[in-house]
Amino acid sequence: MSLVIAVYGKGGIGKSTTSANISAALALKGAKVLQIGCDPKHDSTFPITGKLQKTVIEALEEVDFHHEELSPEDVIESGFAGIDGLEAGGPPAGSGCGGYVVGESVTLLQEMGLYDKYDVILFDVLGDVVCGGFSAPLNYADYAIIIATNDFDSIFAANRLCMAIQQKSVRYKVKLAGIVANRVDYTTGGGTNMLDQFAEKVGTRLLAKVPYHEMIRKSRFAGKTLFAMEEAQTEFPECLAPYNEIADALMQEHPIASVPVPIGDRELFKLVNGWQ
């Protein structure tokens, strides 16, 4: 059975870039990885495959939504380091429900028996609204990871995600492996001062600290993981280190994880004054 990881974070937080680099680090350490993009934007696997691949919803449309007519080859593309990628996709803007599409994709994976074919399955999930469909990966995940930056809006979203994880943990095995601090800037962004306090408050840890670095942005535009960028390998190893740390933590026999204890919304707003 695969190790199933669900990566969440608010839109624009760098969640997909982080997910792709975690997948790359895991693959380079010997794991067979499937990364699943669960966002209507369907660009999660772009750094792995170098293209916007066909989505599950597009493939289903071609067979008039008869699941049984699809095979893994219809929806999976292989890319960097042998990583396989799948994109759930979503309905046209202004119509349908993106969460429903994610839920359908999770069901399709089960029907195809893919949960037994990989060492690691990593879901990259939109985390602004954790409704039924978008929370579906938590039903299968061993561990959740939250991507956040050192600002209130990001922490507010992270707290809502902690609520979802706590609720799911009542019926499912999922636990929170930690928070990845992204775009860490000690010059103007306060480092991780707010995230450190939040993590302690909800009973988790900072799994890694990813620096705010031009090299990471360049890799995204190039359609590559950092591990595929020679410049990153030779000149900016500090950009690669956090993803290797995360991979090492996840590949332990018993990764450190916990059920978070979220803060009430009003309490969180009150705490902000102490973080200024």
Curated annotation (Swiss-Prot):
ATP binds at residues 12-17, 41, 182-183. Its cofactor is [4Fe-4S] cluster. Pathway: Porphyrin-containing compound metabolism; bacteriochlorophyll biosynthesis (light-independent). SUPFAM superfamilies: P-loop containing nucleoside triphosphate hydrolases. GO terms for molecular function: 4 iron, 4 sulfur cluster binding; ATP binding; metal ion binding; oxidoreductase activity, acting on iron-sulfur proteins as donors; oxidoreductase activity, acting on the CH-CH group of donors, iron-sulfur protein as acceptor. The keyword Transmembrane does not apply. [4Fe-4S] cluster binds at residues 97, 131. Mg(2+) binds at residue 16. Component of the dark-operative protochlorophyllide reductase (DPOR) that uses Mg-ATP and reduced ferredoxin to reduce ring D of protochlorophyllide (Pchlide) to form chlorophyllide a (Chlide). This reaction is light-independent. The L component serves as a unique electron donor to the NB-component of the complex, and binds Mg-ATP. Belongs to the NifH/BchL/ChlL family. HAMAP family: ChlL_BchL. Homodimer. Protochlorophyllide reductase is composed of three subunits; BchL, BchN and BchB. This is Light-independent protochlorophyllide reductase iron-sulfur ATP-binding protein.
